[in-house]
Design a protein with these regions (language model features):
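Conserved serine/cysteine hydrolase catalytic core
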Residues: 206-254
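Alpha/beta-hydrolase fold catalytic core
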Residues: 2-50, 73-74, 113, 187, ...
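Flexible "cap/lid" loop of the alpha/beta hydrolase fold
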Residues: 132, 139-174
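Hydrolases whose catalytic domains are alpha/beta-hydrolase-1, hotdog thioesterase
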Residues: 126-130
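Active-site loop/oxyanion-hole signature of alpha/beta-hydrolase fold enzymes
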Residues: 33, 40, 68, 78-118, ...
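Conserved HGGG/HGGXW glycine-rich cap/lid loop of the alpha/beta-hydrolase fold
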Residues: 35-86
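Short N-terminal helix/helix-N-cap motif within the alpha/beta-hydrolase-1
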Residues: 60-68, 86-89, 151-152, 246, ...
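Catalytic active-site module of serine/aspartate enzymes centered on a nucleophile-bearing elbow/loop
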Residues: 258-300
Length: 300
């Protein structure tokens, strides 16, 4: 007989393995910027392409729930960044903006016609760096909670932390079970819901430990520096913020030539996961401006 206390765990175990992507989706590889990059694609002839770049330790399928909301109108390409998902691991001499060139190569290899480029966290830096370096390529840019204002750093965190310790921590998470990771996700991020946690958990098992060994060669440009070079219309979806932090975010966003910032009420760093409906309410009208829009037409 199953006790009441064990029933929730049993149910979680039964559903912990996320189902496969929809059968209409495809996946593949391209050679870009010296690596083999994996991607998932929703497809659809004649649809405006959106390239989605995930955050650190996530992978392409972490976009699945958002992609399902948008695929009827857009051809969505969900990449696995180097060192993530099924893509090749990073290299010790990777430039700090290497992922911008990874995106450029993928777009070229897939022959995407001026895609919209969207990124979260680490992916938002990649998307912004790409749009700054290749200003004539993106039709539009969407940045989910990019780092606009300086954030306090905990002692021992970030670039000063022991890279071997970080590497060991990534490997330890690689070896955790799907059920255990999903349970942690549901406990720590209850607003996400089960399907988001089911997509999140496998990405932690595929995250390559070598991503912990370096932060990239060269000086990392600030978002202010990148924004000054971005020509495409840009939407920033920021976590909820008040007071001075909100003002700082808006000040940096104002550097964009054709930008807008929306602080999503109730959302933390994982904006779309915390508040999907509010995110979609801001995202859909912006994307609709570029459905089949002629590049350079200045859709506003």
């Amino acid at each position: 007989m199953i006790g009441k206390a064990s029933l929730p765990y049993l149910l979680l175990t039964l559903v912990a393995v996320a189902g496969p992507p929809p059968p209409s989706w495809t996946d593949g590889y391209v050679i870009t910027n010296g690596i083999r990059m994996h991607y998932w694609r929703t497809g659809g002839s004649g649809k405006t392409p959106i390239v989605m770049a995930h955050g650190s330790s996530d992978d392409g399928l972490c976009w699945a729930n958002l992609a399902k909301e948008l695929e009827s109108r857009y051809d969505i390409i969900m990449i696995d960044a180097r060192g993530h998902g099924l893509s090749d691991p990073p290299k010790v001499d990777d430039a700090v903006d290497v992922q911008a060139d990874d995106l450029a190569g993928l777009i070229r290899e897939l022959k995407l016609d001026h895609p919209i480029v969207m990124g979260h966290s680490m992916g938002s830096f990649a998307a912004a760096a790409f749009a700054a370096k290749y200003p004539d390529v993106p039709r539009a840019v969407v940045l989910e909670d990019p780092n606009l204002a300086a954030r306090p750093t905990a002692p021992g965190a970030g670039a000063n932390a022991d890279p071997q310790a970080r590497r060991a921590a990534v490997l330890a998470r690689n070896n955790r079970s799907q059920a255990d990771l999903v349970a942690d996700c549901m406990k720590n991020s209850p607003k996400w819901g089960l399907s988001e946690c089911e997509a999140w958990a496998p990405s932690k098992r595929r995250h390559h430990p070598d991503t912990a060994l370096g932060r990239g060669v060269g000086a990392r440009p600030s978002m202010s520096d990148l924004f000054a070079k971005i020509a495409a219309p840009t939407l920033i979806l920021k976590a909820e913020a008040q007071g001075e932090l909100r003002q700082q975010n808006e000040k940096v966003a104002a550097i964009l030539k054709r930008g807008q910032i929306v602080h999503i009420e109730g959302a933390g760093h994982n904006v779309r996961r915390d508040e999907k409906q509010r995110t979609l309410a801001a995202l859909r009208p912006f994307l609709a401006r570029f459905d089949g829009a002629a590049v350079g037409a200045g859709s506003e």
